[in-house]
Amino acid sequence: MQRDHTMDYKESCPSVSIPSSDEHREKKKRFTVYKVLVSVGRSEWFVFRRYAEFDKLYNTLKKQFPAMALKIPAKRIFGDNFDPDFIKQRRAGLNEFIQNLVRYPELYNHPDVRAFLQMDSPKHQSDPSEDEDERSSQKLHSTSQNINLGPSGNPHAKPTDFDFLKVIGKGSFGKVLLAKRKLDGKFYAVKVLQKKIVLNRKEQKHIMAERNVLLKNVKHPFLVGLHYSFQTTEKLYFVLDFVNGGELFFHLQRERSFPEHRARFYAAEIASALGYLHSIKIVYRDLKPENILLDSVGHVVLTDFGLCKEGIAISDTTTTFCGTPEYLAPEVIRKQPYDNTVDWWCLGAVLYEMLYGLPPFYCRDVAEMYDNILHKPLSLRPGVSLTAWSILEELLEKDRQNRLGAKEDFLEIQNHPFFESLSWADLVQKKIPPPFNPNVAGPDDIRNFDTAFTEETVPYSVCVSSDYSIVNASVLEADDAFVGFSYAPPSEDLFL
């Protein structure tokens, strides 16, 4: 007889917290949304709620459970609702309110509380018999389905909201296009993927992982951010920051290698981004010059999160064989368990390439290159400083347990003498002028993109949307494989 895991799930005591709140703007209106993290057993997900929704739940519960003496912060009639201290204080009060809800079974089993926390949504329930990859692909799955927009909710995005101007990139599943939003004339990079190709290659988990990671990127200056995601019956759309300083790969091809001070600057910004991802239990796994963009003034922006692995803490490991051959760490090639330190190996490989012009163990024959990565000693040529030699040797250490970053992760990178002349606080605030400026002419300048892409004709099919084919965050999505893909920020807060 099969065990009823759903019943186990419902009997579990949830834990909740409000890690952050965000201010949103649309049509000159400002509003605050509180991000609630819900954990039950092996499952975790985010629910986005406005103050009005907390207030409604509170008023329902206080009538039914007067002895509980529940409290939430009062509505503010006068004063600045967006004062940081006020928002911080309100968030703390709302956090205390939901903590009280999960202390007592009679409260957290109340239908309104379960609905508020989305506890009965089937996609949040996990079967202990599932393997690690299956569980992690569902973890923190579908932020968008948890946004309760109410009767005046945000209209979903759709292809006809944009003018698609140029092809600026291509990948295995589709194209990246420069697009201008008709509403306000803002420029975005829109990644358009063919569902059929994704499904045929069984890559839907990676696409959903990419979407989940993109939603968490908004807090870091060196990671590309997601504005919208939506889908039609045939395609998936990511609406992203348009970063038009060109790929690091593009500039490396033109210049062969970079001076050490320039390579150091890029390596530091890349390391900062990787350190942030590691801090939220994400391993990037695909660092390479093609995935490193420069913005309009020359700062680094990491993109393409399809190979990211979620839910990996510093002491955790995973085993999936993935990445780009030139940058694979030895433990990945050996199909051994690996951890965050694969990203530090990749940082070493990219830094080596920036300084010397080629990846450290490069060979046209992939089998021979793998053998080089596994067994060949690192070759360091003259022309760089002793601290550069040192960090390359420590990052490109074949034994992951002895690699720089193995013990204290990003902190070890920060403290290496190679970065001694650099202020990390200034770096993350973009106070250090980039050593190279791409000199873009404007927000729609595409000179730093390969003409092999930009001269292509924009496919008409990416621009087409009809009402029956659009699927968005507020309705049941047509294809179960991509449930939770769509995302749009909420449009207004009823009680600021």
Curated annotation (Swiss-Prot):
Polar residues bias located where? 139-151
Q: Per UniProt, what is one Pfam family of this protein?
A: PX
Q: Name one GO biological process term.
A: negative regulation of extrinsic apoptotic signaling pathway in absence of ligand
Tell me which residues bear Phosphothreonine.
320
Annotated phenotype, changing residue 486 to D: Increased activation
Q: What is its main location?
A: cytoplasm
Q: What domain of life is recorded for the organism? A: Eukaryota
Ranges annotated as biased composition (Basic and acidic residues): 1-11
Any single Gene Ontology cellular-component annotation:
recycling endosome
- Which positions does UniProt annotate for ATP binding? 168-176, 191
Q: Which SMART domains does its entry note?
A: PX (SM00312), S_TK_X (SM00133), S_TKc (SM00220)
Stretches assigned to the Protein kinase domain: 162-419
Localization, UniProt: Cytoplasmic vesicle; Early endosome; Recycling endosome
Q: Known EC number(s)? A: 2.7.11.1
Q: Which Gene3D superfamilies match?
A: Phosphorylase Kinase, domain 1, Phox-like domain, Transferase(Phosphotransferase) domain 1
Which keywords describe this protein according to UniProt?
ATP-binding, Cytoplasmic vesicle, Endosome, Kinase, Nucleotide-binding, Phosphoprotein, Serine/threonine-protein kinase, Transferase
A molecular function (GO) term: protein serine/threonine kinase activity
| Positions annotated as active site in the UniProt record | 286 (proton acceptor)
* Broadest EC class assigned to this enzyme: transferase
Q: Does the keyword Kinase apply?
A: yes
- Modifications made to the protein after synthesis: Activated by phosphorylation on Ser-486 by an unknown kinase (may be mTORC2 but not confirmed), transforming it into a substrate for PDPK1 which then phosphorylates it on Thr-320.
Per UniProt, residues of the AGC-kinase C-terminal domain are 420-496
Give the protein's biological function: Serine/threonine-protein kinase which is involved in the regulation of a wide variety of ion channels, membrane transporters, cell growth, proliferation, survival and migration.
Q: State what protein this is by name.
A: Serine/threonine-protein kinase Sgk3
Organism per entry: Homo sapiens
Q: What is the lineage of its organism?
A: Eukaryota, Metazoa, Chordata, Craniata, Vertebrata
